[in-house]
UniProtKB/Swiss-Prot annotation:
Protein name: Serine--tRNA ligase
Similarity comment: family membership: Belongs to the class-II aminoacyl-tRNA synthetase family. Type-1 seryl-tRNA synthetase subfamily.
Binding residues annotated for ATP, in chain numbering: R273, S274, E275, E360, I361, S362, S363
HAMAP family, alphabetized: Ser_tRNA_synth_type1 (MF_00176)
Organism from which the protein derives: Vibrio vulnificus (strain CMCP6)
């Protein structure tokens, strides 16, 4: 969430920055609430000061042996206490309204993020690789998978429902190989520590990374979600929409040493999304699923290092595509297409031949201090007493299912076989083709 001080001292400037991403900050309501807060705060402080002064008088009278005088003044203390409690309740109510507003406010975009309404206004930064030309009729990954009896959508529908998949044989092995390759690359060459994390998380974790309270409908919950998780209600949990949630929350309520930063973590997990609002989109194939695997990259950095870290993290995701020899493009998301908590985001879009277009396969974001403030994730500089908020970054490195789509379609051959990328062959028992 944003620093509440921005709504107190830079309200108009903050509203103008948020307007770039199409968000209208209710300046009038915030201004009125802030005036109420200041007024009530002054009353609370005056009542506290008066009570302290009277308490001091009582102590002096008691020391002087004037018990009768002390008792008379004590009656005033009782009345002041009631008034003070009432004002504190008023103050809490106003603060709660301000907190509700702050929690609904997205992150401020970086200055270099282009203005825009939607994905059509994103800025292409670069391209890598050239889409192949084929002298035969292309098949999409669904047809290729069904030809090889490796992608079984019908069984998944029977077992669970739409937007799920059963993989078999070499297709299942390819799916596993892709994830293993990504983890090995990121841990052995890019310096990430592999993490195994829970696939179920509590409400505090989802609040920390920004999914709650705004995006609860996009999640799968084991039971109706409570605002606060507790040991007495351990089953009121949610399936993770991304490993970003459990991995980033590892630093919640912690103070790291400056020397330990940056923290670089990676995890391979299934991800679960209800895809609310996407009815009718990408209904065929593996592009948009309720359950899909992803290798996530997370970095925790000092504030001054986070922008360089975003370039590095994005480069790590790009390296996966380059080693797999998959054509892709890198785009800088415009203000209208950014995620709720993002300060700056790059998308990597891989070439999907059957659709004759580029499709998102990775989203890499600098969340600035937006998540850290929610999580109270901090660090302490050497020689300093006061801790500071860290910056958090995350990105897909990559989405496994969409990577598989790209491999199947880009590497198909005229006889229906699929060429296995060289870097994956050792994970496939030395096989060079599927089919």
């Amino acid at each position: 969430m944003l620093d509440s001080k921005l709504l107190r001292t830079e309200l108009d400037e903050t509203a103008a920055k948020l307007a770039r991403r199409g968000f209208k900050l209710d300046v009038e309501t915030i201004g009125k609430l802030e005036e109420q807060r200041k007024s009530i705060q002054v009353e609370v402080e005056n009542l506290q000061s008066t009570r302290n002064s009277i308490s001091k008088q009582i102590g002096q009278l008691m020391s002087a042996g004037d018990k009768e005088g002390a008792e008379k003044i004590k009656q005033q203390i009782g009345s002041l206490g009631s008034d003070l409690d009432a004002k504190k309740i008023e103050l809490d109510a106003v603060m709660a309204q301000l907190d509700d507003i702050i929690l609904s406010v997205p992150n401020i975009p970086a200055d270099e993020v282009p203005n825009g309404k939607d994905e059509n206004d994103n800025l292409e930064i670069s391209r890598w690789g050239e889409p192949k030309s084929y002298d035969f009729e292309l098949k999409d990954h669904v047809d290729l998978g069904e030809m090889g009896d490796g992608l079984d959508f019908a069984s998944a529908v029977k077992i669970t429902g739409a937007r799920f998949i059963v993989m078999k044989g070499q297709f299942a092995r390819l799916h596993r190989a892709i994830a293993q390759f990504m983890l090995d690359l990121h841990t052995e060459e890019h310096g990430y520590t592999e993490m195994y994390v829970p696939y179920l998380v509590n409400a505090d974790s989802l609040f920390g990374t920004g999914q709650l309270p705004k995006f609860g409908k996009d999640l799968f919950h084991t039971e109706p979600l409570t605002e606060k998780a507790s040991d007495e209600e351990p089953r009121k949990l949610s399936l993770i929409p991304t490993a970003e949630v459990p991995v980033t929350n590892l630093v919640r309520d912690t103070i790291s040493d400056e020397a330990d930063l940056p923290l670089k973590m990676t995890a391979h997990t299934p991800c679960f999304r209800s895809e609310a609002g996407s009815y009718g989109r990408d209904t065929r194939g593996l592009i948009r699923m309720h359950q899909f695997d992803k290798v996530e990259l997370v970095q925790i950095t000092k504030p001054e290092d986070s922008m360089n870290a975003l370039e590095e993290l994005t480069g790590h995701a790009e390296k996966v595509l380059q080693l797999l020899e998959l054509p892709y493009r890198k785009v800088l998301l415009c203000t209208g297409d950014m995620g709720f908590g993002s300060h700056k985001t790059y998308d990597l879009e891989v070439w999907v031949p059957a659709q004759n277009t580029y499709r998102e396969i990775s989203s890499c974001s600098n969340m600035w201090d937006f998540q850290a403030r929610r999580m109270q994730a901090r660090f302490r500089r050497k020689g300093e007493k006061k801790p500071e908020l860290v910056h958090t970054l995350n990105g897909s490195g990559l989405a496994v299912g969409r990577t598989m789509v790209a491999i199947l379609e880009n590497n198909q051959e005229a006889d229906g076989r699929i060429a296995i990328p060289t870097v994956l062959q050792k994970y496939m028992g030395g096989a060079t083709h599927i089919g």
